[in-house]
Amino acid sequence: MLSLLKKGPSANKVPAEKIQATYGRYRMQALLSVFLGYLAYYIVRNNFTLSTPYLKEQLDLSATQIGLLSSCMLIAYGISKGVMSSLADKASPKVFMACGLVLCAIVNVGLGFSTAFWVFAALVVLNGLFQGMGVGPSFITIANWFPRRERGRVGAFWNISHNVGGGIVAPIVGAAFAILGTEHWQSASYIVPACVAVVFAISVLVLGKGSPREEGLPSLAEMMPEEKVVLKTKHGQKAPENMSAFQIFCTYVLRNKNAWYVSFVDVFVYMVRFGMISWLPIYLLTVKHFSKEQMSVAFLFFEWAAIPSTLLAGWLSDKLFKGRRMPLAIICMTLIFICLIGYWKSESLLMVTVFTAIVGCL
């Protein structure tokens, strides 16, 4: 299977007079492909969260069992992000990403026909493992086509894909329920999003690009020599493209203190984010006494409110903080803590929704 994901041969060289136009077009296509692809991963991930009230009602699962299912998927996803991203270094980004989407879709079809708890557990673990195939190709594609001075804004644009994807899950599933009815809740919750994900996987294959060299263009360093970064390496060390995934990890990740700082911060960011996403439906329905329609609106606001703030954060980190990402992250984490207290203590529908949106923003 891994051999099918390997990078293909380089395309014929683009004529010199067409290089600039082709480069501009290809890099926009490459960015659009990973935007749409990563968006689709969230369609076949967050749909599980929206199905949790029905897991309680229709399959009689307890809150503890639902929490265990969510934890299994997220732990598998966390492990997979590291492993799959390493494998993606040696694969075709577009094929790797599309393959992961199709596998997630297949797992969701399985969820649409399952009723036993342990079958659900096995399938959500598989879904978590395949979900990890989305982030690596995205980072690789952005690094291949965009110089460092643009990556704050480009990364911010790409990052809103998961908010768009998470935000459109509720309308997709809601429309499926309207058409199929609540008696077909599994089809509406799992099979319909799976079909949508397959359509997006096809778009990734059509739009996606390899590195500039693989597309017959000069490398990024040749196109933008002012952005060329000379890596200081130890004597005799091999170039990254000739190193194994394990060697790259040991050299550029394990010994990189900045990578550890970012990982440490990310632990707490994801703790809040996935804690909110995983429990928001049940919490709002059972504790805050929202209706299912009101809960869906709050879920949508949590995701979509992050879109403008993410773009603003990318611009601020590039312009105001001169490329330093950590100060803004610390400010946002402090504000998140304050807003979580408001989310917890508020009783009115409006204020709970507002604090939900602000946490999503940050």
Where are these regions (language model features)?
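Helix-breaking motifs and short loop linkers at transmembrane-helix boundaries and internal kinks
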Residues: 60, 92, 113-118, 289, ...
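Conserved MFS/SLC helix-loop-helix module at the cytosolic interface between two early adjacent transmembrane helices
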Residues: 79-117
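Cytoplasmic membrane-interface "Motif A"-like loop-to-helix N-cap segments
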Residues: 90-101, 319-333
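Cytoplasmic helix-loop-helix junction between adjacent transmembrane helices
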Residues: 123-162
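Helix-loop-helix hairpin linking two adjacent transmembrane segments in secondary transporters
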Residues: 158-212
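Helix-to-loop junctions at the C-terminal end of transmembrane segments
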Residues: 81-92, 310-323
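Extracytoplasmic gate region of multi-pass secondary transporters
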Residues: 48-52, 252-311
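C-terminal transmembrane helical hairpin of 12-TM major facilitator-type secondary transporters
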Residues: 323-362
